[in-house]
A protein has these predicted regions:
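A glycine- and small/hydrophobic-rich beta-loop-beta segment
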Residues: 254, 262-338
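Short acidic-hydrophobic, aromatic-tinged amphipathic segments that line or gate anion-handling sites
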Residues: 3-8, 175-180, 300-305
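C-terminal core of ALDH-fold dehydrogenases
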Residues: 306, 314-439
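N-terminal Rossmann-like NAD(P)+-binding subdomain of aldehyde/semialdehyde dehydrogenases
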Residues: 1-117
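Conserved NAD(P)+-binding/catalytic subdomain of aldehyde/semialdehyde dehydrogenases
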Residues: 172-259
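Short internal beta-strands
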Residues: 147-156, 260-267, 273
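Conserved small-residue-rich beta-alpha loop and adjacent elements
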Residues: 102-166
Length: 442
């Protein structure tokens, strides 16, 4: 495989060092929340957000006032985007069926899809108010039927952001708290004097929020590891450098540690894209962030063949993968490891982030190898059940169960089967033995 890097980002060792520092900070912060509750949350909010309201939880009157501050057009835009997310989530929900089957006479097996009973939705917004993240978590949880939805978002410029709060409320949040970072996800998962802990945390965030969710997993469920934004552009000479550069920088502006990768089989496109990035960084208002992100985490990878591009893409397993080639559907068919695909030059990651309807909370840091993104199914637990309705079935299944338990050395397990073989089948099975084999004529 001939793979050439025309530009590399930080070495993996340096990235791992950054992750290790984050882990230490998060661990200490979560311990403080567990020990000190609301007091720790208030101290952290004062330190990081310079925000100490009488109550972090918004009242209905405060929510109404914030929504009233938005224009009719702003509200219409929010409602349009939320409708697209709801429509797709509902279609996904409709595809998830409860089932019940009789696998043999008298044996009924089934499963039910039951909503998680309480969910904490984190909506990032300290640097940019992430209105769309409220649709992705809160509205999707509502479609799933979650009966208790808490939403948290940091203050923006020292106060609640009206658009984010409106999206949370319209999405169906039952409680809205203005707090961000580790303290928000920690309070929702651990609980405080004023916040009842949730069963599950969802939503994207910076490296500290993502690490906090990782450390809290087990105490609560999480949707997935959704850390700093990642984007990959897979392109050939059917598109130009301006388009590729725009798509790369459009995601690099998220934060200082947002990886952006161009994967191509065209040297000309690779070189043109590098020149276009230099040009665009001179006029991009968020260049102070995007330039650092591109310098430290940007990569341009040149391959000889489409098969090589596919192999490299699956190895990187990027969160967002923009495909602009003469064979977009081939990549859709062949790729196995990614967060979400954006197929064709008419499509772009920003549409997926904000309005098109698919969920933008997606796996990062190679998590796309083992999970997809947030969707309505993440809020549902599939629980199985079984029942035996006839004496014959209780006897037959019990006989096999008895012998298989004894094969593993579990006498107590076997007796659960044997007592039913005796009662419902009239067969004498001595205690501590497996059920006898029956001849075919029996």
């Amino acid at each position: 495989m001939a793979v050439e890097y025309l530009k590399r980002g930080k070495p993996d060792a340096e990235r791992a060092e950054d992750d290790a520092k984050t882990k230490v900070v998060v661990e200490a912060t979560l311990k403080g929340i567990e020990l000190r509750g609301d007091a720790a949350v208030r101290d952290l909010s004062a330190k990081f957000d310079n925000y100490t309201p009488a109550s972090f939880k918004l009242s209905q009157a405060e929510i109404d006032d914030l929504i009233a501050s938005l224009s009719d057009r702003e509200l219409a835009d929010i409602k349009f985007a939320q409708a697209q997310v709801r429509n797709f989530a509902q279609a996904q929900r409709d595809s998830m069926l409860d089932i019940e089957v009789e696998t043999m006479p008298g044996v009924i097996l089934g499963h039910k899809n039951i909503p998680v009973q309480s969910v904490g939705c984190y909506v990032p917004g300290g640097k940019f108010p992430m209105v769309a993240s409220a649709h992705m978590s809160v509205a999707t949880a509502t479609v799933a039927g979650v009966p208790r939805i808490i939403a948290c978002t940091p203050p923006f410029n020292g106060k609640p952001n009206a658009a984010v709060i409106a999206a949370m409320h319209l999405g169906g949040a039952h409680e809205i708290h203005v707090m961000g970072g580790i303290q928000a996800v920690g309070a929702m998962a651990i609980g405080t004097e004023t916040i009842e802990p949730v069963h599950m945390l969802v939503g994207p965030g910076n490296a500290f929020v993502a690490e906090a969710k990782r450390q809290l997993f087990g105490r609560v469920g999480i949707d997935l590891f959704a850390g700093p934004t990642e984007t990959m552009v897979i392109a050939d000479d059917t598109v130009d450098g301006e388009l590729c550069a725009t798509d790369l920088l459009g995601q690099a502006e998220h934060g200082y540690n947002s990886p952006s990768v161009l994967l191509t089989n065209s040297r000309k496109l690779a070189e043109d894209t590098l020149r276009e990035i230099d040009r665009l960084l001179k006029i991009l208002p968020t260049a102070d962030t995007a330039s650092i992100s591109w310098a430290d985490y940007g990569e341009v990878i040149l391959c000889d063949t489409y098969d090589e591009m596919l192999a490299v893409a699956d190895d990187i397993a990027s969160e967002h993968v923009q495909v602009m080639t003469d064979r977009d559907d081939w990549f859709l068919e062949k790729m196995t490891c990614y967060g979400a695909l954006f197929l064709g030059a008419r499509t772009n990651v920003s549409n997926g982030d904000k309005v098109i309807g698919t969920n933008h909370t997606l796996p990062t840091k190679k998590a796309g190898r083992y999970t997809g993104g947030l969707w309505v199914g993440k809020f549902l637990k599939t629980h199985s059940y079984q029942k035996i309705t006839t004496d014959d079935a209780a006897t037959l299944v019990g006989e096999y169960g008895s012998r298989l338990c004894m094969l593993e050395g579990f006498v107590g397990h076997a007796e659960q089967c044997n007592v039913r073989v005796r009662r419902y089948g009239g067969i004498n099975v001595p205690y501590g033995t497996g059920a006898p084999y029956r001849d075919a004529k029996d």
